[in-house]
Amino acid sequence: MAAVAENAMSTTSSIFNERQINCTILGGARSEKKSVLNVAAILLNSGNSYLRLQNLENLTKCGFEKIVSVENDSKNFNLDDLLQNFPEVKFVIPLEKAADGDLINVAMAEIDSPCALVLRDSIHITQKILTAQLSENLAAQDVFCIVPRIFAQDKTAVPIKFVPGVKKSVLNIESDLQISNDEPTLYPFDFFGFYNTKKFKRLGGYDYSIKKPYWQNLDLAFRAWLWGERIKISTGLSLSYAEEIPLVDSTPDISQLRFFLKNMAPVVKDGRADLPLSKFLPFKARSSCGIFEAFRQFSSARNWVCENERRFSIDAFTLINDWGKI
């Protein structure tokens, strides 16, 4: 086998406790085809999609600068056949269980392109999924993430516009099917998006300590807004599911608590963020943790906020109250 295995490290920067993901990276030979897009493609694979080979073949004909195919299990596929059929594709094979965000971090570390389109093997990927003109237009907007329109198998629209609010002192996110081009949305549905890679890395990528995909996705998106970045909708970019839409598990758990401490609890004043000690008792009341574990989690988040105090532009209160004006 000509490909050489490499060890990969998460792109999560020093704003988190860095974590090395044990994985193998193979392939990625220089293609003789000229790339027409100054964009990389990241394909998240479930391992059981019947569209796998067709999607990879179509991606190689789209003109992407680089293609990174990310597996969710080391036993999901015939490696030798894929490397032979798609030598230009770089395959990331995790050797341990990792969340989607962790795997996207690894893929982002493997690309130098200014932008990356994150996809899944559960959607229809055509050779015209992203044209050169649309790619240039999206990249020129210089925002952290641009969210595509998404359609279900039956061609019905999937909600992609999410608006933050508060209900009974708890974050309440409402969805809306009515969308227009360039409208803001709180987060990208199912991680789908056209990402600015430099902004992604400056934000620190996904937090590996948040295990549940919904909260991991929401954490990075919320952080982007609080740190002065934007996420918006493009009606010119669209994706369609070829399989059932995955259920979204937003059940509050320890992942939600980590999200709360990093995003909802900090207060920004005079250009600095702080997680006040006065927030500990309310946090303890909602956490259902023992006093020592609750204090450990609170202290960890407080240290993180302190390290990044100057990165915050606004706090959650301002984001929610001024939504649509920012």
Pin down the residues of each PLM region.
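A short, conserved alpha-helix in the catalytic core of glycosyltransferases
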Residues: 187-195, 199-204, 210-237
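N-proximal low-complexity "stem/linker" segments adjacent to membrane-targeting elements
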Residues: 2-57
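Non-catalytic, C-terminal membrane-associated alpha-helical segments of glycosyltransferases
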Residues: 251-260, 269-326
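Active-site donor/metal-binding and catalytic loop motifs
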Residues: 232-252
